[in-house]
Swiss-Prot record:
One of its GO terms (biological process) is threonyl-tRNA aminoacylation. This is Threonine--tRNA ligase. Binds 1 zinc ion per subunit. Its EC number is 6.1.1.3. Its cofactor is Zn(2+). InterPro entries: aa-tRNA-synt_IIb, aa-tRNA-synth_II, aa-tRNA-synth_II/BPL/LPL, Anticodon-bd, Anticodon-bd_dom_sf, Beta-grasp_dom_sf, TGS, TGS-like. The gene is thrS. PANTHER family: THREONINE--TRNA LIGASE, CHLOROPLASTIC_MITOCHONDRIAL 2, THREONINE-TRNA LIGASE. Residues 1-61 form the TGS domain. It is an enzyme of class 6 (ligase). Catalyzes the attachment of threonine to tRNA(Thr) in a two-step reaction: L-threonine is first activated by ATP to form Thr-AMP and then transferred to the acceptor end of tRNA(Thr). Also edits incorrectly charged L-seryl-tRNA(Thr).
Length: 635
């Protein structure tokens, strides 16, 4: 007999070699019917798994969040099965679950069309309704390679041949379809009911541009129809808010082939950029940071010493000149250490908070570039805090408070924290890691946050905090980070003189709030749907005259606004006033100052705020005061 422990603390005895499904059925027939997978000693397993030892046991159903990834993996197999039935000449490759869905890559001469997707989706519904049994099979490696070659699935044969010897080869069969997979999977295809195929894109085999191009079908799958409908509605809203679309419509920026991944900022977009930089600069000065500027192009010897050359060489832009190899910096930290090392530092100088709007370059694959969200040239709101070990908690608390203030000012109040602790391969002793992790945990709790743990996901040189924002339509964006570093000060020989007179290494805290300004602006465009708050809007007040004889007064108003730092635009053309208002509203300008004869006579303007038809009559001085008051809250 074996002892099986359940989540409620109870322990029951069962005969050896019982399956997970049989255990579920012994608990409740309804539970067995709803069961998708079992968690055995913390690992998800198929219901068909045989249990022959004592274990901790839990049954998972579609209601459990862990099962969403299972459903999506099931849906990927269902997609492949449907494609093979409809287009038997197509070869299947890989199909993992990803955030919000899954994809499956296919090798096929003829590209899939949108009409094909509709047919494939209908076939998937048919296969789901058949409720085909899904079974796990353990195969001999050579037999599996020969089998897939014999049915023309050469990509699968290649994958199996690359699996290290001794690892089990598991295949999953459903109906006439069989696929290589580690699993686990649901017991039948009927579990996958709520799905939709989204699009087709190109993808290189094994992600290598030297390999053949495959066709990637993206899909989404959910546990309930309500979840699917909600997600599709969110996507519809996200499409309206797409920063690339709004960037064109609002004349903020553009990209072009001659400079892939590099932003061409137009005057309005650059205004937003500079306003954010001005805002952050004010915040960090108030919080005791110095601001520096370091070179963009640095000899590779520094990157070799820091370890970046070995780790990130393929992602760096390098050039040869005067028998030297120079690289555009992908990050700022080694350069900040060079500033720290200028002159002797004492414990009295710590903590030293060094910030930079650092221009960095990363050689992202062209296929990974995505508007402002993924670029090759980026500016980080980067800072490094050089401190003693006993200052880590206080510095982290201060950073968390600063970060919270910044996010709140931009309208983000739902902030989640992820804590990544020690990986298996790491620098430093367990004692050092214990102190570091405890310092971060204590700081997060003092700052009023709760956190979720990412076990083993810290960098080899220290634990990490990630700060995740939730936007207006429920999407999550990881922006802020605080990364502890024991290694770089050692590698680059940074030190300070302790109170005892001995030389010590500072701890280095890498931290950012926005991440990159480019990406954060992309997030803001989508968060606000282009309707920037008054203090951040590239044009704060637009002036529109009702008749042309009011133009001289309109120009007087514009000059007064500009002289007082108000960003303005105007339209004194002969066009009708309703047309002018509509055009300025389409540009999402927060305030429109309408000027008629009465406004001219009284030295006033009629203010219409974006999204309303109400008008408020103000003197020019009052209008200036309203805008200045808003600006001064942030700038």
């Amino acid at each position: 007999m074996i002892n099986i422990s359940f989540p409620d603390g109870s322990i029951k005895q069962f005969a050896k070699n019982i399956t997970a499904y049989e255990v579920a059925n012994a608990i409740s027939m309804s539970l067995a019917k709803a069961a998708m997978v079992a968690e055995i000693n913390g690992e998800l397993q198929d219901l068909s798994i045989v249990i022959d030892n004592d274990c901790k046991f839990r049954i998972l159903t579609a209601k459990d969040p862990e099962c969403l990834e299972i459903i999506r993996h099931d849906a990927a197999h269902l997609t492949a099965e449907a494609v093979k039935e409809l287009f038997p000449e197509t070869q299947v490759t890989i199909g993992p679950a990803i955030e919000n869905g899954y994809y499956y890559d296919f090798a096929r001469d003829k590209p899939f069309t949108n009409d094909d997707l509709a047919v494939i989706e209908a076939k998937m519904q048919e296969l789901s309704q058949k409720n085909e049994q899904v079974t796990r099979e353990l195969w001999d490696r050579d037999k599996a390679v020969e089998f897939f070659k014999s049915i023309g699935e050469h990509y699968k044969a290649e994958i199996i041949a690359s699996i290290p010897a001794g690892e089990p080869i598991t295949l999953y069969r459903q109906g006439n379809f069989i696929d290589l997979c580690r699993g686990p999977h649901s017991p039948s295809t009927g579990v996958v009911k709520h799905f939709k195929l989204m699009k087709v894109a190109g993808a290189y085999w094994r992600g290598d541009s030297r390999n053949e191009m495959l066709q990637r079908i993206y899909g989404t799958a959910w546990a309930t129809k309500e979840q699917l409908d909600s997600y599709l509605l969110m996507l519809e809203e996200a499409e309206k808010r797409d920063h690339r679309k709004l960037g064109r419509e609002l004349d903020l920026f553009h990209f072009q082939e001659e400079a892939q991944g590099m932003v061409f900022w137009h005057d309005k977009g650059w205004s937003i950029y500079n306003t954010i930089e001005q805002y952050i600069r004010k915040k960090i000065r108030k919080n005791g940071y110095t601001e520096v500027k370091t070179p963009v192009l640095v000899d590779k010897s520094l990157w070799e010493a820091s370890g970046h050359w070995e780790k990130f060489r393929d992602d760096m832009f390098a050039l040869e000149t005067d028998d030297k190899t120079l690289a555009l910096k992908p990050m700022n930290c080694p350069c900040h250490v060079q500033i720290f090392k200028q002159g002797i530092k004492s414990y009295r100088d710590l903590p030293l908070r060094m910030s930079e709007f650092g221009l960095c370059h990363r050689n992202e694959a062209s296929g990974a570039l995505h508007g402002l969200m993924r670029v090759r040239s980026l500016v980080q709101d980067d800072a490094h805090i050089f401190c003693a070990a006993e200052q880590i908690t206080d510095e982290t608390v201060s950073f968390c408070k600063l970060l919270t203030e910044v996010y709140k000012d931009f309208g983000f109040t739902d902030i989640k924290v992820k804590f990544s602790d020690r990986p298996e391969i790491r620098a430093g002793s367990n004692e050092v890691w214990d102190k570091a992790e405890n310092a971060l945990k204590e700081a997060v709790e003092q700052a009023g946050f709760t956190y979720t743990l990412n076990p083993g996901e810290g960098a080899f040189y220290g634990p990490k905090l990630e700060f995740v924002l939730t936007d207006a339509i429920g999407r999550q964006w990881q922006c802020g980070t605080l990364q502890m570093d024991f290694v770089l000060p050692e590698r680059l020989d940074a030190s300070y003189v302790a109170a005892s007179g001995e030389k010590k290494r500072p701890v280095m805290l890498h931290r950012a709030i926005l991440g990159s300004l480019e990406r954060f602006i992309g997030i803001l465009i989508e968060e606000y749907a282009g309707r920037f708050p008054l203090w951040l809007a590239p044009v704060q007040v637009a002036i529109a005259t009702i008749t042309s004889d009011l133009n001289d007064y309109a120009l007087e108003v514009q000059k007064a606004l500009i002289d007082n730092g108000v960003r303005t635009d105007f339209n004194i053309s002969p066009d009708k006033i309703n047309y002018k208002i509509r055009e300025f509203s389409n540009q999402k300008i927060p305030m429109i100052a309408v000027i008629g004869k009465q406004e001219q006579e009284n030295k006033q303007v009629a203010i219409r705020r974006l999204g309303t038809t109400d008008q408020e009559v103000l003197s020019v001085e009052q209008l200036i005061a309203v805008v200045k008051e808003e600006n001064e809250k942030y700038l």
